């Protein structure tokens, strides 16, 4: 059965859409069959996206402000819908306890948790009126209770940034990441550096856009810091000499500009000769913040517990400082924090 009608909407894409490929010996031998299969698959995805966008536009006309688990906020901002019922409070409590235990086991090191507020927590005024949202104040109170002074609170700093998060993606902007870096520096006794941000692209639509596919969605600018350089980055065995993957700018997910995406373990050699080593336990929010940390450490080991199979304590033993960096709803949902304390 066809995924979508084999004809139709061709004028939308300025060409006739590929019909179902015909399987014949001549077509297979000539290579025509595989070419038509590729075109057909591509066209069905285009049709699916078209209908998703059309459905979202109709729902918006009907007054819906919650489409496919995404709130349509003010100023073209989209927010992931997270309520008290969907925020994983039990797992959040377990993860806080896991980090607390890990920090206690490494009390001879400077251990910091930078748990990032969700976009809607900072930009509450941009949420649709009366939109249900989880109690982030309660979540941060629990953070402070478990981690005390080891918790670096970036909420106020992010609220002072003009665009701390992308409009159509769940990540923070580079400006937001830099503001949080200043909070980390203050909390850990480092002298914060300020870097000029340079536009890498102004054509970014992110993960939340992909859920609604509204054609009038905002494009975001993605900035980076070309002045920050390193000697090498070993990302799961692939070695590069840059913090930035410029080829990501030609792809859909332009946030992969930062290190090219997520890895089980990435080891950065910064070229700073101070002998200091940071262990960074992280989600994808850290990818755009880590460049700002490179001036303070000779080595930074980044670990994503979703993919890493190594024991973490031996990595901590090699480090001078530890930073746990997650966006708060990612932190609550992650089922891998127990790995911190595996012996």
Predicted regions and their residues:
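Short secondary-structure boundary/capping segments
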Residues: 12, 127-132, 338-341
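Short, small-residue-biased leader/transition segments that mark boundaries at the very start
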Residues: 2-13
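Long, hydrophobic, well-ordered secondary-structure blocks that form the structural core
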Residues: 126-136, 161, 167-174
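Extracellular serine-dependent O-acyl
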Residues: 109-117, 133-163, 183-186, 191
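Short, well-ordered alpha-helix to beta-strand connector turns
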Residues: 9, 147-148, 297, 318-320
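Extracellular/periplasmic envelope-modification machinery, especially enzymes
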Residues: 170-172, 176-277, 282-300, 306-309, ...
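Serine-dependent acyl-ester chemistry module
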Residues: 17-98, 121-129
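Conserved, well-ordered alpha-helix/loop/beta-strand core segments that scaffold catalytic motifs
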Residues: 78-142, 264-300, 305-309, 321-322, ...
């Amino acid at each position: 059965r066809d995924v979508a009608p084999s004809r139709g909407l061709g004028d939308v894409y300025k060409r006739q859409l590929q019909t179902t490929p015909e399987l014949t010996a001549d077509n297979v031998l000539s290579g025509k069959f595989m070419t038509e299969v590729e075109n057909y698959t591509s066209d069905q995805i285009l049709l699916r996206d078209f209908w998703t966008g059309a459905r979202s536009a109709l729902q918006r006309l009907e007054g819906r402000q919650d489409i496919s688990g995404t709130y349509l906020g003010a100023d073209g901002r989209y927010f992931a819908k997270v309520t008290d019922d969907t925020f994983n409070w039990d797992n959040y409590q377990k993860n806080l306890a896991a980090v607390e235990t890990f920090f206690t086991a490494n009390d001879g090191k400077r251990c910091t948790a930078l748990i990032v507020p969700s976009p809607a927590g900072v930009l509450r005024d941009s949420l649709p009126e009366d939109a249900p949202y989880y109690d982030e104040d309660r979540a941060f109170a629990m953070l402070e209770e478990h981690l005390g002074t080891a918790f670096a609170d970036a909420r106020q700093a992010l609220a002072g940034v003009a665009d701390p998060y992308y409009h159509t993606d769940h990540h923070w902007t580079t400006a937001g990441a830099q503001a949080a870096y200043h909070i980390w520096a203050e909390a850990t006794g480092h002298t914060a550096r300020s870097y000029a941000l340079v536009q890498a692209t102004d054509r970014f639509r992110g993960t939340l856009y992909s859920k609604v596919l509204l054609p009038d969605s905002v494009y975001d600018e993605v900035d980076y810091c070309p002045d920050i350089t390193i000697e090498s980055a070993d990302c799961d065995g692939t070695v590069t000499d840059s913090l930035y993957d410029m080829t990501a700018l030609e792809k859909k997910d332009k946030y992969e500009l930062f290190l090219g995406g997520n890895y089980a373990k990435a080891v950065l050699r910064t070229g700073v000769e101070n002998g200091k080593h940071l262990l960074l336990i992280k989600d994808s929010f850290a990818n755009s913040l880590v460049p700002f940390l490179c001036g303070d450490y000779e080595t930074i080991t980044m670990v994503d517990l979703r993919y890493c199979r190594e024991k973490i304590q031996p990595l901590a033993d090699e480090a001078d400082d530890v930073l746990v960096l997650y966006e708060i709803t990612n932190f609550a949902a992650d089922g891998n924090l127990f790995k911190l304390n595996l012996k």
